[in-house]
UniProtKB/Swiss-Prot annotation:
Pfam families, per the entry: MinE
SUPFAM superfamilies linked to this entry: Cell division protein MinE topological specificity domain (SSF55229)
Record-given protein name: Cell division topological specificity factor
Function description: Prevents the cell division inhibition by proteins MinC and MinD at internal division sites while permitting inhibition at polar sites. This ensures cell division at the proper site by restricting the formation of a division septum at the midpoint of the long axis of the cell.
Record-stated family: Belongs to the MinE family.
High-level lineage: Bacteria, Bacillati, Cyanobacteriota, Cyanophyceae, Synechococcales
Signal peptide span: none
Amino acid sequence: MTLRDILNKLMGRQPASAAKARERLQLVLAHDRTDLSPDLLEQMREEILSVVAKYVEIDFEEGAVSLETEDRMTALVANLPIKRTLSGEIKIKEQSSADNSAKAVS
């Protein structure tokens, strides 16, 4: 996702049909190069979302995992909107800080 894409999304602008077609073509090419089926990509998406959801609250409907190709390199890109951190993670950080403080005193 380019800076222009981010700004357009924030401004509520819809991408031009040519941009959508280009994105679809890049996705098809990336799938062909990696030999990943759409079913496998969806399974990976679900697993990635479930792992990330252990640590932060995410928007499952808006979460997207895609393949992007740039300069002959294909990347798996996860765009996961985070709603908030989970209280368990905060406790882990606090516990870690307490452990470090106790070690410093010893």
